[in-house]
C-alpha cells in the first residue's frame, strides 16, 4: 500500500509519515524542501520516495500526481498549507494568492485526480487537512479561515456524493485546533490556547 503526503517535511505531515510507516505503508513524501524530506526518509522504517514540489504551482501539482498514480496508490493526504496573520486591509495580496493556490487549488486538483482514479478501482482514501478554522469566521486571518472552510465543505460534499454512489472510496477532513508546528512561525501568530503536540493529532 502506498500513501502520498504533501507538506511532509514538518509538523502534521511529518508525524503522519511516521504513523503510516509504522503500519507498513510505502510513502511518497512531498514538500518544497528536498533536504528535509530526505532526512525524514532516512528516519522512517519503510520504503520512501521523495518528490520536491511546490503544490501551489498547478503544473507541479499535476506532475506530482502523474508521478505517483498507479494501482498501488491507496492513500492521498493533502496536508500542505500555510496561513498569514494580519488585517485583511494590510496583508500582502501576492502571499494571499499563493496561500489560496496552496490551501485550495492544490487540494482541489489532487482530490479530483485521486478520487477519479479511486472511484474506477472502487477503493482508496483521501484525507484533506482542514482546521477548526473552517467552522468559524477569522478576523486577522480572514483568507486562511476562508481557505479551510473551502477544504471542509468540498470534502463534506464529495463524501455525500460518494455515499450516494455506494462507493467504497473514503474521504475525510481533519479539523484540528491550534497545533504546535512551524505553521505558527510562518503565519506570524501566537494563539491564546497552547497548541497540541503534532504527534497527538
Predicted features by range, described:
Residues 9-10:
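Conserved glycine-rich cofactor-binding loop
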Residues 23-39:
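Conserved glycine-rich Rossmann-like NAD(P)H-binding loop of the short-chain dehydrogenase/reductase
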Residues 131:
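Residue(s) in the substrate-gating loop at a strand-loop-helix junction
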Residues 111, 147:
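Active-site helix of classical SDR
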Residues 87-88, 95-100:
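Substrate-binding pocket helix/loop in short-chain dehydrogenase/reductase
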Residues 53-63, 93:
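The beta1-alpha1 cofactor-binding region of Rossmann-like NAD(H)/NADP(H)-dependent oxidoreductases
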Residues 153, 160-201:
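SDR active-site lid
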Amino acid at each position: 500500500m502506498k500513501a502520498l503526503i504533501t507538506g511532509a517535511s514538518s509538523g502534521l505531515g511529518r508525524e503522519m509519515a511516521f504513523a503510516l510507516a509504522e503500519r507498513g505503508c510505502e510513502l511518497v513524501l512531498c514538500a518544497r524542501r528536498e533536504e528535509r524530506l530526505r532526512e525524514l526518509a532516512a528516519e522512517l522504517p519503510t520504503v520512501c520516495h521523495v518528490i520536491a514540489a511546490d503544490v501551489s504551482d498547478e503544473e507541479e501539482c499535476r506532475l506530482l500526481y502523474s508521478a505517483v498514480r498507479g494501482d498501488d496508490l491507496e492513500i492521498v493526504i493533502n496536508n500542505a498549507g500555510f496561513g498569514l496573520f494580519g488585517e485583511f486591509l494590510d496583508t500582502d495580496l501576492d502571499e494571499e494568492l499563493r496561500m489560496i493556490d496552496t490551501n485550495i487549488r492544490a487540494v482541489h486538483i489532487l482530490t479530483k485526480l485521486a478520487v477519479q482514479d479511486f472511484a474506477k478501482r472502487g477503493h482508496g482514501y483521501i484525507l484533506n487537512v482542514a482546521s477548526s478554522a473552517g467552522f468559524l469566521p477569522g478576523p486577522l486571518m480572514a483568507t486562511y479561515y476562508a481557505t479551510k472552510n473551502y477544504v471542509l465543505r468540498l470534502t463534506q460534499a464529495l463524501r455525500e456524493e460518494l455515499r450516494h454512489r455506494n462507493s467504497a472510496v473514503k474521504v475525510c477532513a481533519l479539523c484540528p485546533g491550534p497545533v504546535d508546528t512551524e505553521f505558527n512561525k510562518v503565519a506570524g501568530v501566537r494563539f491564546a490556547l497552547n497548541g497540541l503536540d503534532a504527534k497527538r493529532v
